Amino acid sequence: MFSAWDRRERPPEEGAAAGLQGFGVDKTFLSSLKGILLETELALTFIIFICFTASISAYMAAALLEFLITLAFLFLCATQYYQRFDRLNWPCLDFLRCLSAIVIFLVVSFAAVTSREGAAIAAFVFGIILVSVFAYDAFKIYRTELMPSTTEGDQQ
């Protein structure tokens, strides 16, 4: 087995993905249900970020943080780069991402609507829509990945 130092000195193997060529986008993922959910979450967080920037700039950090986290998950899933980190429980991380976004956007949306500005009210409406999208995503993750499977012996 080669050490990390030995791997750096060797030239790249023929046919091996080098540099950014290893980041090929899986277009089937982008058109799957999970890909569409991530794209919808990304678009809505960006809209909310713009609304908070126009009205209450104190809340824009929460939307920006969730935008960057969702963008990172979309990038990792679309390029299948997450498979290189096999020690992480990706379904659990994705589930926790959805739960934290639900809590953050519920709190921030209800806090923003108290200002009664037009952009803040729009951020509230988009925030509630986004919370429902995150809740559906969390439900799908739990249902397909995290829910313990029942066997015939467990049902009796």
Curated annotation (Swiss-Prot):
It holds the Pfam family MARVEL. The keyword Cell cycle does not apply. GO terms for biological process: chemotaxis; negative regulation of myoblast differentiation. The chain crosses the membrane at residues 35-55, 56-76, 93-113, 119-139. GO terms for cellular component: extracellular space; membrane. It is a multi-pass membrane protein. Keywords: Chemotaxis, Cytokine, Membrane, Transmembrane, Transmembrane helix. This is CKLF-like MARVEL transmembrane domain-containing protein 5. The gene is Cmtm5.
